[in-house]
A protein has these predicted regions:
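Switch/connector loops and helix/strand junctions flanking conserved nucleotide-binding motifs
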Residues: 248, 302-303
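AAA+/P-loop NTPase substrate/partner-engagement loops
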Residues: 257-291, 298-302
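Pre-Walker A (pre-P-loop) alpha-helix and adjacent loop at the N terminus of AAA/AAA+ ATPase modules
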Residues: 204-239
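Long, positively charged binding patches that form subdomain-scale interaction surfaces
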Residues: 169-174, 210-213, 221, 227-228, ...
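Substrate-engagement module of ASCE P-loop NTPases
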Residues: 306
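Walker A/P-loop nucleotide-binding motif
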Residues: 232-252
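Phosphate/oxyanion-binding active-site loops and adjacent basic polyanion-contact surfaces
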Residues: 214-218, 248, 273
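AAA+ P-loop ATPase mechanoenzymes
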Residues: 1-213, 217
Length: 306
């Protein structure tokens, strides 16, 4: 309806299929058009899509507010990209953002009662007070789920547009935006239509350095080198070698887990994917994070041809 059509900085959000469908149905209702079986089917299709998203990312309680929070977390626009890992600065762009957040606050409190009566369903009311079935952690993005639900509660509690703005600015400062903000590690995937994609690694083991017994001097060297890298100081490339089971992969995971909050991200690349490295660097070069390129299974045999 007119709320969504007035989004400017977050205008791409209005194109998301669930939000767009609900806006069209609400607009039709307000113009006095009858909502029959075909419209009800469209509503159910939108609800199903939202439920699929909720299952993938572990939404719970108020799925509608979780969904809106997720859209805000994922929208890479001039404001959010500037604010990632530093927070919102002072500038005229903030006026556009504040207007958009005023709309999102209204969407957070949106009353679906009239639309439900017109459609003859209560599906939207169910979404706003939802109890998800217990599911294994591997079925959803655990780390993303926690962030979505925490942000959703904070935004729902915002008593003013200014408080809403501060909450989102703090989120972008703490985590960033989009897939790089919400995820710590990535792998490459070759898509015939879209080319090379950076895909988040789901639910990476939450190991810490304390889980590695021994290797104290090696762990300390990794820490010092990583911290220098994060500060923008000179740091070395690192070669981890040793027999299978000696903690090489665990050390990498521990580094990423420990320094994720400081903006460290890891991209896993295999030997046969080296030809895509320039494309990867082009995608990440203007983002406000520090990336480790993790190359596994390197070989230094005399007859190695690659």
């Amino acid at each position: 309806d007119e709320l969504i059509s007035n989004l400017l900085m977050y205008g791409k959000t209005a194109e998301h299929s669930v939000l767009a469908t609900l806006a069209e149905l609400e607009d039709a209702r307000k113009r006095g058009m009858p909502l029959r079986a075909a419209e009800r089917k469209r509503a159910y299709r939108a609800v199903r899509e939202l439920l699929e998203l909720a299952t993938e990312y572990g939404f719970n309680d108020n799925l509608w507010q979780n969904y809106l929070s997720f859209l805000l977390m994922m929208d890479e626009n001039p404001f959010t990209l500037t604010a990632e890992k530093v927070g919102a600065g002072e500038g005229s762009v903030n006026r556009f953002v504040e207007r958009d957040f005023h709309i999102f606050r209204a969407l957070f409190r949106y009353d679906f009662g009239a639309l439900e009566r017109a459609l003859g369903t209560d599906c939207f009311s169910v979404l706003t007070d939802y109890r998800a079935l217990p599911k294994p952690a591997v079925r959803c993005y655990r780390a993303v789920s926690e962030k979505v639900r925490a942000l959703s509660l904070s935004l729902a509690a915002a008593e003013s547009d200014e408080a809403f703005f501060r909450t989102m600015s703090e989120f972008y400062r703490a985590y960033g935006v989009g897939k790089f903000g919400l995820n710590a590690a990535f792998r490459l995937e070759d898509d015939e239509k879209k080319g090379v994609l950076l895909k988040p690694i789901r639910n990476m083991d939450a190991v810490k350095f304390s889980d590695l017994i021994g290797y104290e001097s090696q762990k300390e060297e990794l820490r010092k080198n990583t911290e220098a890298f994060l500060r923008g100081q000179r740091a070395n490339n690192v070669l981890l070698y040793g027999d299978s089971g000696t903690g090489k992969s665990t050390s990498i995971k521990a580094v990423v887990n420990e320094y994720y909050k400081d903006g460290l991200r890891m991209i896993e690349i295999y030997k046969y994917q080296f030809r895509w490295l320039s494309e990867v660097l082009a995608e990440i070069k203007n983002r406000n994070y520090r990336f480790i390129i993790y190359m596994d299974d390197l070989s230094f045999e005399e007859n190695e041809s690659e």
